């Protein structure tokens, strides 16, 4: 604290000794020999980094007020897809309206490394930063230095004269302040007449910025292009952010009938055509095609190529499918309306890795149907995302943000949401009417928590103005006038019914209060992708699978075994018999009855002895078979054991249940495949040995005996 007080008061001292950084090279691949094979990383002194972090936290609280809507990076509540969606929608609007335009993708050369300190400090003064703040920034910049680590030995000190250090928490925020001036410069040039204004109906803003990725919309006129190039040169001279025109590109929109070569003669960059890639996603004029989403499949296959599925247990492959393969398409699915064929191809790769490891997949290798696998854990699945439903949940964020933050640049334009998304959003939200200007009369759930388009489909189909707001529709009963071309005899009853419902709520519009929306699928009332995804499985039957299988302390292979048991997918003799495969019919342990998974674990006399001995040894009477004799399913028996156990012992009882069932299965396999003689004492002893190993591994829920049932 004394050091921070010293820095706060700018009391002098040699801060340069604490504001150093070490630059090391990390290899990008094995056998790296060239400079291009290494990635430099800067390790900043912890004191300087802490001071910078404090300043960045304070600046982050006000950065939204200082930055124009054109910049969407390094800010809370904004994301990369905002910029992509705005640019794509603007391109499509220009294309549909047959408006001639050019999209310029600019490359800023070594953006972070070239920022002028003099420009930055002057900009902070213009933005109203107090002198003390500017002095702190000047101190951090002027005393910074770096040295290169060569074989672990630091080299000569390199003093900095410009630029912002990567790895510094404050650098990203300072950088977007610097580059945001480009947007304001072009807006000023447009206002003064130096640049012709873009079509207002199609492009709200001329510029879209994401960090140093800049897109500019401009009219395809040589004078405008030359003026823009001059402004970019002046901007680079003042800020140090020079545009590398050789790596920049111009993409024409509806410019097939003009001489682009003459217009772009001074541009110096390349000319491209749609589709193009912007921020890692394809921008297309028409419908997206599978070939434009091939990069998603390529990334998944590249991951699979480096994995050795044969060397992984099924539980490990499940984790990789859930956490890696299913996460790869998330970025694209948020902003794009993907094709069903893409989901099929991704599911094929996920299914193959899960069930067939590195071999070709076939139905015979899939132990459980994919529909069940791609179901939430609490409903009996493996919790692997159903990508089609997950994509719906991801896209609902656009409908939610359009309500919550209507100042985003893309609001009012097309979103990737389809009619199914709109219906799901309406079913999961409730709208409170204020002035009625934000709520859709037909699509919003403002009357009794339901959509009028669903409650009165005939009226909705007959309406000629389906996009009216509640405010517009109720003014003079315009919603009734919109039905004037319909067959009044068929819809008269519904008109009367809807009119009565509207009058019954006594709705009074308040011009001073905006409409509000609440997400009904979460107690906070705020949207989340997780709750939107879960809501799509509301019709499924909730069970105790998550608590009985996935939330217990046990190795992954035992959890997978329990899942197969609860799914009745273990290869017992009854399943073999149903398929007409060779089997010995009888239970290998007792040799009395047809072997089924239920008989093997819950009815077999040998298994019952094991449960009895385990209950006595562990002091857990919940494991006594007398408690589940009336149950008819494996899930029912397991639930009865858990509910019978004392509340404080239930976690340990779940682990004990899993371990005993696992060793019964191992003993059964030894009898079938090795011809071993059954010995229930061997099963109990094996359970005791594993319990000791689990305790050493950190299973606190079974550290002590359970004691009697309470």
PLM region spans:
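A helix-boundary/hinge signal
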Residues: 1-4, 9-10, 14-22, 27-58, ...
């Amino acid at each position: 604290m004394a050091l921070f007080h010293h820095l706060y008061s700018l009391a002098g001292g040699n801060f340069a000794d604490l504001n150093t950084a070490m630059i090391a090279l990390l290899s990008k691949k094995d056998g790296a020999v060239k400079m291009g094979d290494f990635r430099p990383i800067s390790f900043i002194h912890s004191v300087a980094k802490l001071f910078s972090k404090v300043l960045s936290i304070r600046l982050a609280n006000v950065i939204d007020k200082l930055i124009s809507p054109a910049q969407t990076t390094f800010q809370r509540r904004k994301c990369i897809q905002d910029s992509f969606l705005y640019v794509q929608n603007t391109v499509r609007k220009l294309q549909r309206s047959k408006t001639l335009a050019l999209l310029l993708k600019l490359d800023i050369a070594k953006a972070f490394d070239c920022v002028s300190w003099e420009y930055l400090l002057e900009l902070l003064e213009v933005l109203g930063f107090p002198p003390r703040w500017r002095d702190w920034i000047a101190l951090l910049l002027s005393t910074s230095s770096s040295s290169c680590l060569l074989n672990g030995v630091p080299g000569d000190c390199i003093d900095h004269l410009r630029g912002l250090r990567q790895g510094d928490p404050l650098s990203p925020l300072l950088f977007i302040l610097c580059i945001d001036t480009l947007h304001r410069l072009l807006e000023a040039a447009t206002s003064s007449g130096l640049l012709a204004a873009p079509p207002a109906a199609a492009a709200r803003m001329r510029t879209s910025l994401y960090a140093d990725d800049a897109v500019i919309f401009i009219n395809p006129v040589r004078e405008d292009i030359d003026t823009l190039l001059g402004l970019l040169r002046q901007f680079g001279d003042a800020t140090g952010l020079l545009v590398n025109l050789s790596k920049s590109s111009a993409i024409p929109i509806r410019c097939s009938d003009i001489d682009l070569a003459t217009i772009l003669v001074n541009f110096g960059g390349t000319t491209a055509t749609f589709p193009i890639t912007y921020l890692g996603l394809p921008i297309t004029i028409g419908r997206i095609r599978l070939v434009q989403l091939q990069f998603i499949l390529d990334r998944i296959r590249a991951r699979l190529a480096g994995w050795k599925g044969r060397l992984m247990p099924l539980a490990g492959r499940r984790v990789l499918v859930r956490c890696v393969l299913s996460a790869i398409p998330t970025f694209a699915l948020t902003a794009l309306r993907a094709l069903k064929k893409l989901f099929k191809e991704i599911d094929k790769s996920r299914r193959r890795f899960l069930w067939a490891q590195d071999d070709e997949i076939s139905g015979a290798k899939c132990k459980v149907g994919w529909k069940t696998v791609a179901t939430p854990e609490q409903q009996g699945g493996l919790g692997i995302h159903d990508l089609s439903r997950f994509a719906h949940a991801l896209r609902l964020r656009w409908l939610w943000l359009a309500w919550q933050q209507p100042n985003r640049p893309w609001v009012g334009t097309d979103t990737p949401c389809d009619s199914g998304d709109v219906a799901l959003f309406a079913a999961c939200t409730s709208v409170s009417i204020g002035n009625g200007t934000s709520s859709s009369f037909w699509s919003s759930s403002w009357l009794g928590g339901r959509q009028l388009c669903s409650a009165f489909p005939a009226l909705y189909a007959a309406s000629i103005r389906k996009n009216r707001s509640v405010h517009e529709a109720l003014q003079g009963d315009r919603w009734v006038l919109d039905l004037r071309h319909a067959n009044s005899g068929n819809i008269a009853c519904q008109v009367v019914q809807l009119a009565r419902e509207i009058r019954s709520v006594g709705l009074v519009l308040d011009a001073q209060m905006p409409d509000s929306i609440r997400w009904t699928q979460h107690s906070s009332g705020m949207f989340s992708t997780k709750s939107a995804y879960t809501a799509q499985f509301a019709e499924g039957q909730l069970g105790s699978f998550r608590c009985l299988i996935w939330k217990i302390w046990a190795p992954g292979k035992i959890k997978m075994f329990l899942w197969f048991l609860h799914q009745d997918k273990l290869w017992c003799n009854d399943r073999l018999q149903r398929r007409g495969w060779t089997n010995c019919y009888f239970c290998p342990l007792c040799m009395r009855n047809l072997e089924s998974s239920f008989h093997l674990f819950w009815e077999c006399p040998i298994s019952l002895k094991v449960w009895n001995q385990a209950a006595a040894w562990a002091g857990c009477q919940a494991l006594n078979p007398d408690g589940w004799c009336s149950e008819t399913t494996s899930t029912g028996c397991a639930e009865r054991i858990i509910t019978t156990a004392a509340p404080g012992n239930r976690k340990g009882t779940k682990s004990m249940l899993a371990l005993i069932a696992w060793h019964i299965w191992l003993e059964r396999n030894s009898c079938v495949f090795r011809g071993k003689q059954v010995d229930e004492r061997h099963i109990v002893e094996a359970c005791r040995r594993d319990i000791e190993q689990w305790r050493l591994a950190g299973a606190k829920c079974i550290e002590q005996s359970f004691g009697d049932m309470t």
